[in-house]
Design a protein with these regions (language model features):
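Helix-to-loop junction immediately C-terminal to a conserved catalytic motif
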Residues: 64
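Conserved ABC ATPase signature
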Residues: 147-151, 155
Length: 254
């Protein structure tokens, strides 16, 4: 049996973690987001999906702190972060992995990770310990001296996620994790998402690869014309006739 449509109101007495309520964004005379509300709990994998131009990128950029909204609120474990820049949101526990490569291409894998650790751990001994842990956990120890520009798509994503974890996030925004990677790398990314979930990190994903995304999420939000039109488990949302009409099509199946 599939779960019903879910809203923040259903969980009002629970710790909803990343809680986005009533976002509104206007570009000139065009309303890009209207009453946009979503939530992500700890250890939950959630996707934001919809047609091109539906408002996914706008919403994601606002949540990440790259753009300001014209209304609404963003809270992280009860703390208001709506006005904080991206780096302050990172320190508060909200990590962000953009679609574009976020690693320093001219540096080695080891130096890429250590650059983030230096911002968060003062003790050289503790930094070295954490560096070795991250290299081992993401199976990139053998790549420690490799330049980032020589990495494959899957290897690059592992390094980027290891870098992200160096700042100890509670929640992570994943922008197009399946874009531009081969089938083997897709399997690796699925495994990485499972690992993050096992660490009780909440994850919000947006991606054009709908099928692969829905295979790994606990819940999905569907946005169209700047509004959330449906949310729930993958099985629930893909069987909604309105979602099929505006986004998935009649023949879509997982």
């Amino acid at each position: 049996m599939t779960k019903p449509y879910l809203t923040v109101d259903n969980l009002i007495n629970e710790d909803v973690g990343l809680n986005v309520q009533g976002l509104r964004k206007v570009y000139k005379s065009r309303l890009a987001l209207m009453d946009f509300s979503i939530f992500v709990t700890k250890g939950e994998v959630v996707s934001l999906l919809g047609p091109n131009g539906a408002g996914k990128t706008t919403a994601f950029n606002i949540i990440a702190g790259m753009h300001r909204s014209d209304g609404g609120s963003i809270k992280l474990d009860g703390n208001e972060i709506s006005t904080l820049p991206t780096y302050r949101r990172s320190k508060a526990g909200l990590g962000y992995l953009p679609q574009e490569s976020s690693i320093f291409r001219g540096l080695t894998v080891e130096k890429n990770i250590d650059a983030i650790l230096e911002l968060n751990i003062r003790s050289p001994k503790e930094r070295r310990k954490k560096l070795e842990e991250l290299l081992g956990e993401f199976a990139i120890t053998h790549l420690r001296n490799a330049k980032a520009l020589n990495l494959s798509g899957g290897e690059r994503r592992r390094v980027e996620i290891a870098r992200c974890l160096a700042s100890k996030p509670k929640y992570i925004l994943l922008d197009e994790p399946f874009a531009g990677v081969d089938p083997i790398a897709i399997d690796e990314i699925r495994e990485l998402v499972r690992e993050l979930k096992n660490r009780k990190i909440g994850i919000l994903i947006t991606d054009h690869n709908v099928r692969e995304t829905l295979k790994i999420v606990d819940r999905a939000y569907i946005i169209n014309d700047g509004k959330i039109i449906m949310s729930g488990t993958p099985d629930y949302v893909i069987n909604d006739q309105n979602v099929r009409r505006v986004y998935l099509g009649d023949k879509f199946a997982l």
